UniProtKB/Swiss-Prot annotation:
GO terms for cellular component: NADH dehydrogenase complex; plasma membrane. InterPro entries: NADH_UbQ_OxRdtase_chain4L/K (IPR001133), NUOK/Mnh_C1-like (IPR039428). It is found in: Cell inner membrane. The chain crosses the membrane at residues 9-29, 36-56, 68-88. It comes from Chlorobaculum tepidum (strain ATCC 49652 / DSM 12025 / NBRC 103806 / TLS) (Chlorobium tepidum). One of its GO terms (biological process) is ATP synthesis coupled electron transport. This is NADH-quinone oxidoreductase subunit K. The gene is nuoK.
Length: 107
């Protein structure tokens, strides 16, 4: 019974989840001022792209989506490491992670 329900999941379901994740990520990036929340929004956007790549890869039968998805995962890991290092330096300098209060990089 459970396997029949899982087999009935189509492209529309995956794309709907992807659009919801992308929308939440864009909302976080556009409206929040905390740098860490903005980074989480960017990660949500990248995960939405991964779901799209994997969905079209599964239903087209090719491996290109899987390869793009692995590339995006590596890119997201590097982006997170670099961005968190920048956020830590901003916090050490300005004692805040609010991006609206950081308008210059000098002390």
């Amino acid at each position: 019974m459970l396997t029949q329900q899982l087999l009935s999941i189509g492209v529309n379901h995956f794309l709907t989840i992807s659009v919801i994740l992308f929308g939440l990520g864009m909302f976080a990036v556009m409206t929040r001022k905390n740098a860490i929340v903005i980074l989480m929004g960017v990660e949500l956007i990248l995960n939405a792209a991964n779901i799209n790549f994997l969905t079209f890869s599964k239903y087209n039968g090719g491996m290109e989506g899987v390869m793009f998805s692995l590339f995006v995962i590596v890119l997201a890991a590097a982006e997170a490491a670099i961005a968190l290092a920048i956020v830590i330096n901003i916090f050490k300098t300005f004692k805040t992670v609010d991006v609206s209060s950081v308008d210059t990089m000098k002390e």
